[in-house]
Design a protein with these regions (language model features):
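G-domain G4 guanine-recognition motif of GTPases
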Residues: 118-120, 141-159, 179-190, 312, ...
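C-terminal effector modules of nucleic-acid-centric enzymes and ribosome-associated factors
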Residues: 12-15, 153-155, 167, 302-413
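Conserved G1/Walker A P-loop phosphate-binding module
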Residues: 1-93, 240
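Residue-level signature of catalytic and energy-coupling elements of molecular machines
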Residues: 20, 26, 45, 92, ...
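Conserved Switch II/interswitch segment of TRAFAC-class P-loop GTPases
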Residues: 84-89, 93-100, 107-130, 136-160
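Conserved catalytic-core segments of large NTP-driven translation/proteostasis enzymes
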Residues: 5, 167-310, 314-321, 326-336
């Protein structure tokens, strides 16, 4: 493979784990990119929006494993030119529990995950439990565990923490996940982590003949203030392609779309537009397939896309998108105990008229339970979602001033 052939990532790998366990530092060690780009995030030292970082994994043809695995063009052991294996995209999801919703909307975009666990703290920490449950719900089964910060504790403590990790993941989807001790800030064992990712998070087989579909994870106006009308560029949407392919010149439909007031009723109308440009990272491409975050330049009025206005929408080939739902019924499963809180609070059943938060793809919306009957709840949404029947949604309840994940449901009608 040459550089040009690997312009677009082929696999999305999420990072999960408790706040301050080193997810963003780990991604930096694997890609040389800090995924905290927003000023508020840098000031508060936390990731609020999903961050994406692309990297090319390489292999030295001379050195033995794991030291042959690298992100460098030249092997640092023997100076041989390295061979390109593949380009992957890391999705950095927020760690704080108040932002669990964003984590869930990000997990919908992951082919595999690195569960980051801080070796200096007892395992599991509350959010580590919550994130593993979230990965389990969304069906991310290909997992590698990175045991971080091994440079600041003794060998005995690392082994003790390793045993805690193995106990924690027993009987979960991460039971057979490899545990790689790593010190990302010094790039110690990064080679072993790349080897584990290559073995345990393969590139998924994708059916590119399916109709194009993409979750919109961000949208913006690229025009500077004061741009002359004749120089204005159309709105840009960014997201991950779930299936199919997209090329310049394609017509796309976006649902639920645009809010329109009709008398007292609020309706949403689908938006139709044309693709005029495609980007992966900073590289312009003619055709895009699943993998990484894709920027799509359109002919939309930039006022429609500014400040993430279209986040939570779904884009696709016209006429192929799922229905827009204002109300739906779900078969729901609630966790036994509240995960992520210091006290393991018991979760009470859903109640009629209770306000809840629903995550579907990249959409986050509030809803009210209108009825419950034999494990099936009917939910009226404040803002509709575009979702297939049998698709999975996450359910959160307001507890102590924040939304906390309490379970999930499958849309049944």
């Amino acid at each position: 493979l040459c550089e040009k052939e690997v312009m677009q990532p082929v696999c999305n790998i999420g990072t999960a784990g408790h706040v301050d366990h080193g997810k963003t530092t780990l991604i930096w060690a694997l890609s040389n990119v800090w995924t905290t780009r927003h000023s508020e995030e840098l000031a508060r030292g936390m990731t609020i929006k999903l961050g994406y970082a692309d990297t090319i994994f390489r292999k030295c043809p001379v050195c033995p494993p794991p030291q042959c695995y690298t992100i460098n063009e030249v092997c640092s052991y023997c100076n041989t030119k390295t061979i390109i294996l593949r380009k992957v995209s890391f999705v950095d999801s927020p760690g704080h529990e108040m932002l669990m919703a964003t984590m869930l909307s990000g997990a919908a975009l992951m082919d595999g995950a690195i569960l980051v666990i801080d070796a200096t703290r007892p395992c599991p920490q509350p959010q580590t439990v919550e994130h593993l449950i979230a990965l389990q719900i969304i069906g991310v089964k290909k997992i590698v565990i990175a045991q971080t910060k091994i440079d600041v504790i003794s060998r005995e403590k690392i082994i003790e923490n390793y045993n805690q990790i193995k106990l924690f993941v027993r009987n979960t989807i991460a039971e057979n996940a490899p545990v790689i001790p790593i010190a990302p800030i010094h790039r110690v064992n990064v080679d072993a982590l790349i080897e584990a990712i290559e073995k345990h998070i393969p590139t998924p087989d994708r059916d590119l003949s399916k109709p194009f579909r993409m979750y919109i994870a961000r949208s913006f106006d690229v025009n500077k203030p004061g741009t002359k009308p004749k120089d204005l560029k159309g709105g840009v949407i960014g997201g991950t392609i779930i299936q199919g392919t997209l090329k310049i010149g394609d017509e796309i439909e976006i649902r639920p779309g645009l809010k329109s007031e009709k008398g007292k009723a609020t309706e949403y109308e689908p938006i139709f537009t044309k693709v005029v440009g495609l980007k992966t990272g900073d590289i312009e491409i003619d055709k895009a397939r699943p993998g990484g975050l894709i920027g799509v330049s359109t002919l939309l009025d930039p006022a429609l896309t500014k400040a993430d206005a279209l986040v939570g929408n779904v884009a696709g080939d016209p006429g192929t998108l799922p229905p827009v739902l204002n109300e739906f019924s779900i078969e729901y499963v609630l966790f036994e105990r509240m995960v992520g809180t210091k006290q393991q609070l018991k979760i009470e059943n859903l109640r009629v008229n209770e306000p809840i938060m629903i995550n579907s793809g990249t959409a986050v919306t509030l809803g009210t339970i209108s009825s419950i009957h034999r494990g099936i709840a009917t939910i009226s949404l404040k803002r509709p979602i575009c979702a297939d029947f049998k698709s999975r949604v996450a359910i959160s309840r307001r507890i102590d001033g924040g939304w906390r994940l309490i379970g999930y449901g499958i849309i049944v009608n």
